[in-house]
C-alpha cells in the first residue's frame, strides 16, 4: 500500500542522513518549463504543442488527419471553456496549460487515490487517510532516528484541513491533489512555507537564523573546511534573504526564498496563443478561432491526440 507523504518524508530523511556533507539541499520550488523546445514560431510550433498538450502528449504528430485533429481539438476547447459561455479567455487558457503540465501529478494522485478511498465513495476522508497511513504505526514505539509519528500525523491533518476547501473533512480529487502536492496550488503556499520553517527552525522561535539556514543545507561532520557554496549561501542569507537585516528570516522572507515569483510561463503562453488566434481581436477566443489555428495548437499533421483526446476524460 502506498503511503504519502509519510513514506516520502521517511525516505527523504534517510537520504538526508546518508548524504555526503558536500551535497547541497535545495528547498526552492521552481515551475517546470512548459517545453524543452525552443520557442521559435518562425521555425515550428513544437513549443506551443507541448505547452498546450503536455510534453508526453505532444511527442508524435503523424497519427491523425487534419480533419480528425480539428475535430478532437474542438473537444478539448469545450473543456477549456469552463463556464460554457462559448468563449475561451486568457485565464481559462492559462488554467488549461497548467493542468496539462500537471498530468504526471494527476497520474500520481490516481495511484494514491486507489490506496486511500477505502469505501469507494469518490472521496478520501481524513479518517480514511489516517487509517491507511498511520493506523498500524501509532501503536509502535517511535524509532531512534527522531521520528514522532503522532507529530507527523498532526502535521498531515493540518495540511489536509488546509486542502479541504469546503471543510467537510473529506477530499475530492482536486483537494487530495492539493494535499499531496501543495506547492502546485496557490491556496496551499502558506502551508508549504510553514512546514519548511518548522523543519529548519531548531530553537522553536518561529524564525530561521543564519545557523539554522546553513545547518539545513550543510552538515560539517567533522570537516573543518567549508565548501565554497556554503560561503556563498551565508552571503545570500545576509545580503538577500534577510531583507530587514534582523539576522533571521520570518514567514514572508522564507516565502520569497522558497517560492520565488518566477516568470509565469503558462500565463505568457496563454497570452501568446490568444494573440495569435484572436481573429476579431476581442480579447477572447471562440472554438472556431482556435480550430482555425489548429496548426499552432496541435500541429498541421495530426498530433498525439491519441493520448490527449482518447484519454480526454482525465482532462
UniProtKB/Swiss-Prot annotation:
GO terms for molecular function: calcium ion binding. Ca(2+) 4 binds at residues 201, 203, 205, 212. Ca(2+) 5 binds at residues 242, 244, 246, 248, 253. Its main location: endoplasmic reticulum. One of its GO terms (cellular component) is endoplasmic reticulum. PROSITE patterns: EF_HAND_1 (PS00018), EF_HAND_2 (PS50222). Keywords: Calcium, Endoplasmic reticulum, Golgi apparatus, Membrane, Metal-binding, Repeat, Sarcoplasmic reticulum, Secreted, Signal. The keyword Signal applies. Ca(2+) 6 binds at residues 278, 280, 282, 284, 289. Ca(2+) 2 binds at residues 117, 119, 121, 128. SMART domains: EFh. It comes from the Eukaryota. InterPro entries: EF-hand-dom_pair, EF_Hand_1_Ca_BS, EF_hand_dom. Residues 22-42 are annotated as: Disordered. Ca(2+) 3 binds at residues 164, 166, 168, 170, 175. Ca(2+) 1 binds at residues 81, 83, 85, 92. The keyword Calcium applies. Residues 68-103, 104-139, 151-186, 188-223, 229-264, 265-300 form the EF-hand domain. Pfam families: EF-hand_5, EF-hand_7. Residues 1-19 form the signal peptide. Involved in regulation of vitamin K-dependent carboxylation of multiple N-terminal glutamate residues. Seems to inhibit gamma-carboxylase ggcx. Binds 7 calcium ions with a low affinity. This is Calumenin-B. It comes from Danio rerio. The lineage of its organism: Eukaryota, Metazoa, Chordata, Craniata, Vertebrata. The gene is calub.
Amino acid at each position: 500500500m502506498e503511503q504519502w507523504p509519510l513514506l516520502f518524508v521517511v525516505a527523504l530523511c534517510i537520504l538526508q542522513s546518508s548524504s555526503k556533507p558536500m551535497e547541497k539541499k535545495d528547498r526552492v520550488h521552481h515551475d517546470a518549463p512548459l517545453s524543452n523546445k525552443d520557442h521559435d514560431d518562425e521555425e515550428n510550433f513544437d513549443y506551443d504543442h507541448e505547452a498546450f498538450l503536455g510534453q508526453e502528449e505532444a511527442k508524435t504528430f503523424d497519427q491523425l488527419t487534419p480533419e480528425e485533429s480539428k475535430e478532437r481539438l474542438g473537444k478539448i476547447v469545450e473543456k477549456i471553456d469552463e463556464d460554457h459561455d462559448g468563449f475561451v479567455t486568457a485565464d481559462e487558457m492559462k488554467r488549461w496549460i497548467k493542468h496539462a503540465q500537471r498530468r504526471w501529478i494527476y497520474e500520481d494522485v490516481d495511484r494514491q487515490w486507489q490506496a486511500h478511498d477505502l469505501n469507494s465513495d469518490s472521496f478520501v476522508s481524513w479518517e480514511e487517510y489516517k487509517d491507511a497511513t498511520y493506523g498500524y504505526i501509532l501503536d509502535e514505539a517511535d524509532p531512534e532516528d527522531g521520528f514522532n509519528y503522532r507529530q507527523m500525523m498532526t502535521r498531515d491533518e493540518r495540511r489536509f484541513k488546509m486542502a479541504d476547501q469546503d471543510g467537510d473533512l473529506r477530499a475530492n480529487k482536486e483537494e487530495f491533489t492539493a494535499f499531496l502536492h501543495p506547492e502546485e496550488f496557490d491556496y496551499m503556499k502558506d502551508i508549504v512555507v510553514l512546514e519548511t520553517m518548522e523543519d529548519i527552525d531548531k530553537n522553536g522561535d518561529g524564525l530561521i537564523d543564519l545557523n539554522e539556514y546553513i545547518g539545513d543545507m550543510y552538515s560539517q561532520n567533522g570537516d573543518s573546511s567549508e565548501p565554497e557554496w556554503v560561503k556563498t549561501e551565508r552571503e545570500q542569507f545576509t545580503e538577500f534573504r534577510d531583507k530587514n537585516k534582523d539576522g533571521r528570516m520570518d514567514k514572508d522572507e522564507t516565502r520569497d526564498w522558497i517560492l520565488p515569483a518566477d516568470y509565469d510561463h503558462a500565463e505568457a503562453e496563454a497570452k501568446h496563443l490568444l494573440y495569435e488566434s484572436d481573429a476579431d481581436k476581442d480579447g477572447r477566443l471562440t472554438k472556431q478561432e482556435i480550430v482555425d489555428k489548429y496548426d499552432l495548437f496541435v500541429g498541421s499533421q495530426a498530433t498525439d491526440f491519441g493520448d490527449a483526446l482518447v484519454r480526454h476524460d482525465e482532462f
